[in-house]
Amino acid sequence: MIVISSHRALKDSPEVAKNQIRAHKSWQNVFDEILYFGDPEPELTCPKTSFITSEDFPPIAAMATAASMGGDFACLINADIVVSKGLIWAMGDVWKRGGMAATSKRYEFVDENLNDAQIVDVGIDFFGASYDLWAQVAKRVPPHYRVGHSSWDTWLMGFFNTVAPQQYWDITNRRCIYHPKHGDRKRAHHIKAIDDIYTLSCGFPMLRL
């Protein structure tokens, strides 16, 4: 299983560095390959890691194209998301049930305490899908959707609900996806969301593990 993300420069702030390094350490225990869009960072480097030089806020289409090339399940995850080993089993169960895609709400934690993490919003920082479904995303996602824009997840949820409604799973109950409580947010606010047939179908999957 592959993970694809876009990281911020660790020099941006100590908080950004801490959160992304913590996430990267958790990914090494779960994923076979780790692919970052952005300049190389020594502290995010391991034998599993590759970097693709990219502009800030890379297009979702570019990341989906990369996800489509692995011949396996690939996950798009925000760079500060900690994952548990349970994600391996959750995605395996999705596959066994004929699933093609999955998402999860995030459990917010403070300091290093994952045990007491709680769902505090409906933010989505994780999507997993088969490589062939990512290929469809790459062809259809509008070019204005980029990492850092709060509506790209709306589009992607709607797309999966539309093209794979019986193969799209909510794995929230498996408690695999953790998000650190933090400030210092950086968003591409200048991008205007434009509704289409997919954004109008946004919603969590009907199927749940």
Predicted regions and their residues:
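Hydrophobic targeting segments
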Residues: 1-5, 27, 33-36
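Short, well-ordered alpha-helix to beta-strand connector turns
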Residues: 31, 70-71, 98-99, 164
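Short, hydrophobic beta-strand segments that form beta-sheet elements in well-ordered domains
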Residues: 31-40, 100-104
